[in-house]
């Protein structure tokens, strides 16, 4: 009987172990994503004149606008405040996602 090829010391037992480890990591990542989706993240502009609340899956859940931020003569100011609050909320979600998921992707890039 011929000799089996050597794949750098990676026998079938090692391959099965790697597959098992990858499945476990996938389950952990899915649990982290589900946990993030249940959390809320807030972006605020101009001393809470506009507050945007996002879920962890980046969906806008609430947008509060203080009546003092509404100036009929300056709609651009309100637009800028909304954009600022929304961008800050999205950044909060992204930062939390990176902190949570980064441990799984470190070294893969």
Swiss-Prot record:
Domain of life: Bacteria
Keyword Iron-sulfur: no
GO cellular component, one term: cytosol
Disulfide bond positions: none
Assembly notes: Homodimer.
Family recorded in the similarity comment: Belongs to the YbaB/EbfC family.
Function as written in the Swiss-Prot or TrEMBL entry: Binds to DNA and alters its conformation. May be involved in regulation of gene expression, nucleoid organization and DNA protection.
Protein name in the entry: Nucleoid-associated protein LJ_0424
Organism field: Lactobacillus johnsonii (strain CNCM I-12250 / La1 / NCC 533)
